[in-house]
Amino acid sequence: MSNHPLLQCINLCKRYQEGQLHTDVLRNVSFAIEPGELMAIVGSSGSGKSTLLHLLGGLDSPTSGEVIYQGRSLNQLSSTAKAELRNRELGFIYQFHHLLPDFTALENVAMPLLIGGSKPAEAQEKAHEMLAAVGLAKRSKHRPSELSGGERQRVAIARSLVNNPSLVLADEPTGNLDQRNADSIFNLLGELNVRQGTAFLVVTHDLQLAKRMSRQLEMRDGQLQHHLTLVGAE
């Protein structure tokens, strides 16, 4: 492991204000992710998990505190620089795959490369490689409507990894799948972690799946618990 964290957040706070009323969604959240680490953050709906992920990915800005990615403070980056970082260095997986319905699996996976300026032939070749890595080489010409739920999520995983990111942020990646497909997706994440050295931060309410990660933290009422009391509970 590196001497420096891959990503670090320091005293992150997020407050939503409406008139005289305010809601503190995150309160002084601090932790670090090491290169190649598999980390899960568990918590119930409304605990602040998704908000935290948005801040870590530069999709939203904290009220106070700081996110540092490979030595760069996201607070200091322009919107354009944040977009470039997300496209080139971070991957995202969501509960609902967010695939473009009119494009094939191959075209969906190639999209981040094309946005980043890759030549179409190079983008398609890399997209083919990633679809093969997730077991969908023979489904590359199918559109999302022609794929099962598990297959669509595999396409989304391939898309998240096509730029060889150091870190993938996954928001309830198995929340829309049955148990068999959920198990398959988590097994795949573990395989890709070993094969490519990609770090994964997964937020989930599924305790059994969270146990498969190398480290688990708990989000409770906007605060991060570094001693996980929920894992192992019935």
Curated annotation (Swiss-Prot):
Where is the ABC transporter domain positioned along the sequence? 7-233
Enumerate the residues binding ATP: G43, S44, S45, G46, S47, G48, K49, S50
What is the annotated localization of this protein? Cell inner membrane
**Membrane topology reported for the UniProt record:** Peripheral membrane protein
According to the UniProt entry, its GO molecular function terms are: ATP binding; ATP hydrolysis activity; transmembrane transporter activity
PROSITE patterns assigned: ABC_TRANSPORTER_1, ABC_TRANSPORTER_2, LOLD
What Gene Ontology biological process does one annotation of this record name? lipoprotein localization to outer membrane
Keywords for the protein's UniProt record, in alphabetical order = ATP-binding, Cell inner membrane, Cell membrane, Membrane, Nucleotide-binding, Translocase, Transport
> Which Pfam families does the record cross-reference, listed alphabetically?
ABC_tran
Q: What is its EC number?
A: 7.6.2.-
Where's it mainly located? membrane
Could you list the residue ranges that cross the membrane? none
Q: Which GO cellular component term is one of those annotated? A: plasma membrane
Could you say which enzyme class this protein belongs to? translocase
Q: Name the InterPro entries for this protein.
A: AAA+_ATPase, ABC_transporter-like_ATP-bd, ABC_transporter-like_CS, ABC_transpr_LolD-like, LolD_lipo_ATP-bd, MacB-like_ATP-bd, P-loop_NTPase
Tell me which domain of life the UniProt entry assigns to the organism this sequence originates from: Bacteria
NCBIfam families, A to Z = LolD_lipo_ex, PRK11629.1
What family is reported?
Belongs to the ABC transporter superfamily. Lipoprotein translocase (TC 3.A.1.125) family.
Q: How does it assemble?
A: The complex is composed of two ATP-binding proteins (LolD) and two transmembrane proteins (LolC and LolE).
Q: What does this protein do?
A: Part of the ABC transporter complex LolCDE involved in the translocation of mature outer membrane-directed lipoproteins, from the inner membrane to the periplasmic chaperone, LolA. Responsible for the formation of the LolA-lipoprotein complex in an ATP-dependent manner.
| The protein's name in its UniProt record | Lipoprotein-releasing system ATP-binding protein LolD
Species annotation: Yersinia pseudotuberculosis serotype I (strain IP32953)
Q: What is the lineage of its organism?
A: Bacteria, Pseudomonadati, Pseudomonadota, Gammaproteobacteria, Enterobacterales
